A protein has these predicted regions:
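A short, conserved structural fragment
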Residues: 71-81
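Short, hydrophobic-biased segments on the C-terminal half of alpha helices
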Residues: 67-68
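Short alpha-helical segments that sit at the start of domains
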Residues: 4-36
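Short acidic, hydrophobic short linear motifs in intrinsically disordered regions
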Residues: 43-54
Length: 99
């Protein structure tokens, strides 16, 4: 199988997975936000919007706008840090979609 054919197969698999999770309608930036939050979660870490902004090197206003849209859609949650009330902890909360 050629490298291009492998790429096409991978792209199709990724597209199917996005549809299954219900995130196929999201922008590239939204998917990157979810990626970094999930990566932090798997490592046992939490992230704030400020920390996410530092990692992603995205304009703050853009990141906050996309982040709030993801909160409104129920894909991420935002909660006050119990140790620092000024900090909001954000995490992935993608609901399971039952077909």
């Amino acid at each position: 199988m050629s490298k291009f054919a492998k790429f096409i197969k991978f792209t199709e698999m990724l597209s199917d997975a996005e549809k299954e999770l219900g995130i196929d309608h999201l922008s590239g930036l939204d998917k990157r936000i979810l990626y970094f939050l999930e990566k932090a979660s798997v490592a046992g870490n939490s992230m704030s919007f400020e920390e996410l902004n530092n990692v992603m090197d995205t304009p703050r206003a853009t990141l906050y706008r996309h982040g709030q849209t993801l909160v409104d859609r129920g894909l991420i949650s935002k909660q006050k840090d119990p140790d620092d009330g000024r900090r909001n902890i954000i995490s992935v909360t993608i609901p399971v979609r039952i077909s």
